[in-house]
């Protein structure tokens, strides 16, 4: 085991604080509409230019081990905030640095760190309650666009694109961000339920221009097993043929004689059919088949439910207005399922989302909700170079998460004003002793810091602006984009309540831990390798190589 070194009290804390400051100083220059860029080196390929706080934080590893511990603690603030709210990472970092800086002064003066932390926690709890009081729900597409614009560093086109996507797929819909192929941003919307399985034979294609199979008003057969024997299918095929409507078969697999017969009948025009594999695997496949059944008003033909292919009737088949089947995707448009059953299924999946322990499971369940309740939109980010696309894509991701947070918990005035306004509630707070009162003062001072940094990045005098905003009330604040004072809600400078709340809580949590740290244990640096002795390899005379 490697030898360890231990540092105590002020010496340990001062080294940790140095690390906090190094990371925070690199991250905070990105804050606000006039935030600066940070260039990140890459071992391979072009460097990355970004204004995304968490991207900058993740890149930082310091050579000094103790400083690096401090930097990693603040990196944790940014990561936690990003995971919970998807945005607000720079605000959280700025708040954490301010709380640590102010707290260090009091600890150095001999105040009890634990009482300071109790005061900090009390002030933050009061600030969060006040934030909830001044928060208002997002009701219009315009407000959603404004929130997205602020999060995207003031780029209106991104805000408009995200608002349009939410309009098209609804608040429950899935919106994903991809690299585009052109200079402009594009929005692709998939109506209905889409899953990643295509036709089992190209002979099902009836639209050669698009290379897809399109069928109108089809019946939909859902089966959880392989189909290889055509005799199992004959009864249901005969019933569908009599109805004169096409048939979509979704099963674990369709192969051999069964697939060949379907292809021949399709080519001859006897029965228009398309066969695709069921999406997913194992239990997830069963759940997805059940989703499709509920959406289309059919039933999954499975032994568990006591249904067999031979005895299947038209009543057990699903229906839809249209089906589009490509090489890799199948889209069910306007399923005939009962709205109440679909709503009940969505509620059931939402319960599973709350109980899910892994991010992967939660993401897949959220996709299922979107496919049942809304739709899927893809924002394709355009740009002239790969570097520009990557930088813009980071901002679109932030903006997307911010709008989700705004829909969830509402909005507050942006530009650091909400944190200035909650100071009023904290001023009246009293701790159990003088040290706790000092903890409350730490938070009071730290709440100014995001506004100070936004103003500094905009090239203005921070103290003057903070004083003027503090004199005002309600939504009055400083718009760094225009350099003017006014009602920030009216001018569209908004922040999601969840982002502001999460940033403050996470910053206070990690800063409190750092202030109450009294010892650090770290691996002792290894001694430098001894210099090579004279007369070693290559020590011969000129022109000789031993």
UniProtKB/Swiss-Prot annotation:
Positions bound to ATP: 30-33, 51, 87-91, 415, 495
UniProt-listed Enzyme Commission number(s): 5.6.1.7
Keyword annotations from UniProtKB, A to Z: ATP-binding, Chaperone, Cytoplasm, Isomerase, Nucleotide-binding
GO biological process, one term: protein refolding
Entry-linked Pfam families: Cpn60_TCP1
Gene3D superfamilies attached to this UniProt entry: GroEL, GroEL-like equatorial domain, TCP-1-like chaperonin intermediate domain
InterPro entries, per database record: Chaperonin_Cpn60_CS (IPR018370), Cpn60/GroEL (IPR001844), Cpn60/GroEL/TCP-1 (IPR002423), GroEL-like_apical_dom_sf (IPR027409), GROEL-like_equatorial_sf (IPR027413), TCP-1-like_intermed_sf (IPR027410)
Cellular compartments annotated: Cytoplasm
Top class in the EC scheme: isomerase
SUPFAM superfamilies: GroEL apical domain-like, GroEL equatorial domain-like, GroEL-intermediate domain like
Enzymatic reactions: ATP + H2O + a folded polypeptide = ADP + phosphate + an unfolded polypeptide
Molecular function per GO: ATP binding; ATP-dependent protein folding chaperone; isomerase activity; unfolded protein binding
Keyword Membrane tagged: no
HAMAP family in the record: CH60
Family: Belongs to the chaperonin (HSP60) family.
Function: Together with its co-chaperonin GroES, plays an essential role in assisting protein folding. The GroEL-GroES system forms a nano-cage that allows encapsulation of the non-native substrate proteins and provides a physical environment optimized to promote and accelerate protein folding.
Subunit structure: Forms a cylinder of 14 subunits composed of two heptameric rings stacked back-to-back. Interacts with the co-chaperonin GroES.
Protein name per UniProt: Chaperonin GroEL 2
Source organism (scientific name): Burkholderia cenocepacia (strain HI2424)
Lineage summary: Bacteria, Pseudomonadati, Pseudomonadota, Betaproteobacteria, Burkholderiales
Gene: groEL2
């Amino acid at each position: 085991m490697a030898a360890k070194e231990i540092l105590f009290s002020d010496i340990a804390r001062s080294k940790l604080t140095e690390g906090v400051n190094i990371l925070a100083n690199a991250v905070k220059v990105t804050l606000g509409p006039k935030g600066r860029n940070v260039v990140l080196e890459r071992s391979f390929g072009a460097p990355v230019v970004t204004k995304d706080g968490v991207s900058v934080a993740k890149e930082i590893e310091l050579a000094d081990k103790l400083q690096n511990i401090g930097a990693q603690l603040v990196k944790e603030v940014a990561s936690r905030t990003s995971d919970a709210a998807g945005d607000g990472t720079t605000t959280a970092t700025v708040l954490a640095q301010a709380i640590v800086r102010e707290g260090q002064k009091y600890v150095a003066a001999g105040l009890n760190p634990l009482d300071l932390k109790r005061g900090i926690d009390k002030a933050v709890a009061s600030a969060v309650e006040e934030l909830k009081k001044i928060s208002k729900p997002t009701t219009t597409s315009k407000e959603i666009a404004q929130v997205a614009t602020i999060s995207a560093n003031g780029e209106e086109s991104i805000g408009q694109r995200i608002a349009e996507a939410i309009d098209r797929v609804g608040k429950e819909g899935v919106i994903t961000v991809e690299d585009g192929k052109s200079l402009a941003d594009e929005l692709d919307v998939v109506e209905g339920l889409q899953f990643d399985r295509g036709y089992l034979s190209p002979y099902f294609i009836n639209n050669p221009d698009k290379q897809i199979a399109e069928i109108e008003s089809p019946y939909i057969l859902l089966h959880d097993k392989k189909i290889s024997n055509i005799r199992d299918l004959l009864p249901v095929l005969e019933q569908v043929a009599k109805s004169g409507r096409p048939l979509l078969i979704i099963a674990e697999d369709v192969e051999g004689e069964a697939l060949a017969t379907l292809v021949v009948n399709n080519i001859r025009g006897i029965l228009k059919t398309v066969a695709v594999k069921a999406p997913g695997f194992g239990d997830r496949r069963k759940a997805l088949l059940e989703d499709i059944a509920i959406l289309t008003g059919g039933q999954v033909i499975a032994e568990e439910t006591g249904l067999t292919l031979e005895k299947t009737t038209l009543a057990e088949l699903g229906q839809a207005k249209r089906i589009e089947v490509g090489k890799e995707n199948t889209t069910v448009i306007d399923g005939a399922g009962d709205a109440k059953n679909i709503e009940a299924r969505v509620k059931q999946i939402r319960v599973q989302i709350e109980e899910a322990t892994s991010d992967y499971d939660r993401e897949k369940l959220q996709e299922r909700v979107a496919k049942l309740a809304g739709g899927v939109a893809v924002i394709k980010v355009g740009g002239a170079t790969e570097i520009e696309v990557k930088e813009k894509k980071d901002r679109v991701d932030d903006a997307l998460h911010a709008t989700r947070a705004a829909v969830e918990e509402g909005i507050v005035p942006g530009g650091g004003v909400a944190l200035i306004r909650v100071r009023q509630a904290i001023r009246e707070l009293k701790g159990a002793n003088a040290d706790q009162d000092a903890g409350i003062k730490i938070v009071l001072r730290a709440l100014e810091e995001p506004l100070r940094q936004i103003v500094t990045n905009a090239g203005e005098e921070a103290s003057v602006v903070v004083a003027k905003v503090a004199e005002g009330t309600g939504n009055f604040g400083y718009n760094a984009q225009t350099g003017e004072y006014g009602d920030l809600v009216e001018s569209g400078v908004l922040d999601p309540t969840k982002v502001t709340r999460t940033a403050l809580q996470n910053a206070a949590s990690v800063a409190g831990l750092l202030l109450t740290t009294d010892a650090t244990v770290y691996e002792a640096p290894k001694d430098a390798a001894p210099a090579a002795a004279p007369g070693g390899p290559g020590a011969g005379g000129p022109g000789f190589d031993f």
